[in-house]
Regions:
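Cationic, low-complexity basic patches in intrinsically disordered or flexible, solvent-exposed regions
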Residues: 9-10
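Alpha-helical scaffold domains
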Residues: 16-230
Length: 230
């Protein structure tokens, strides 16, 4: 499995003034839905952003959907240090235009598990280059990138093969005490378990996980899940 080559040059050019006007309009609609209590709670649990209005994810998705797919706008919004704009960008981005090379610029914005999950849900799982991006991100020392990669493949069940399952042991060993990596691995293996032809590979992967809290969590979760499928 080959990963992504480095990004060599910008892929999109756009009118800064036009994008700024669209951003201001989106931000105004987001601010009307702000919830300070939610923002404070997210900060307490480590969901740090430059600016956070505490707007719910369903509302962000709904507002973003009115823009349609506009990849250059999404790139612009994603660079802003505002939670709602960064998350909206992931639903405005066109997954078909997420090239393997461009993935590195999106990776820089994955600063917490919330962004990682939305990236996996809205963009990465729908990208035609998912396999290559998975290889690159899952090999990263950045647990958020690895988590996004695991969750994206879990959502696109048909892409899971023996090679991907085998790679989980290396991901878990690299992040042996990470709870979110453990959760991502469980999500992927649970999706893989729907295909009985992969059962042997899953069991071998669980045996090869090694030691650590992440490995223990994965084995415990997968034990009852596999039993339930028998």
């Amino acid at each position: 499995m080959r990963g992504c080559p480095p990004l060599r040059q910008p892929l999109y050019f756009f009118s800064m003034a036009d994008q700024t006007q669209k951003m201001i309009s989106l931000l105004g609609r987001m601010r009307k839905q702000m919830n300070g209590a939610v923002a404070d709670a997210m900060y307490y649990y480590g969901q740090n952003y430059g600016l956070n209005y505490g707007v719910s994810l369903p509302t962000i998705r709904e507002i973003a959907s009115t823009e349609g797919k506009d990849h250059s706008l999404a790139q612009y919004l994603y660079k802003q240090q505002v939670r709602e704009l960064r998350l909206a960008a992931l639903h405005i981005a066109d997954p078909a235009q997420l090239s393997c090379a461009e993935a590195s610029t999106w990776a820089e914005g994955i600063i917490n598990s919330e962004v990682a999950e939305e990236m996996a849900f809205a963009v990465l799982s729908l990208s035609p280059h998912l396999a290559a991006i998975f290889h690159t991100w899952s090999s990263s020392d950045n647990e958020m990138l690895a988590y996004a990669a695991l969750m994206a493949v879990a959502r696109r069940q048909q892409t899971i093969d023996v090679e991907i399952i085998t790679s989980i042991k290396d991901i878990v060993r690299r992040h042996s005490s990470s709870r979110i990596i453990a959760q991502g691995a469980v999500a992927l293996l649970s999706a893989a378990a729907q295909n009985t032809e992969l059962t042997t590979a899953i069991k071998e992967s669980l045996t090869a996980l090694g030691e650590g809290s992440a490995a223990d969590y994965i084995r415990e979760e997968m034990e009852w899940r596999l039993e339930a499928l028998q």
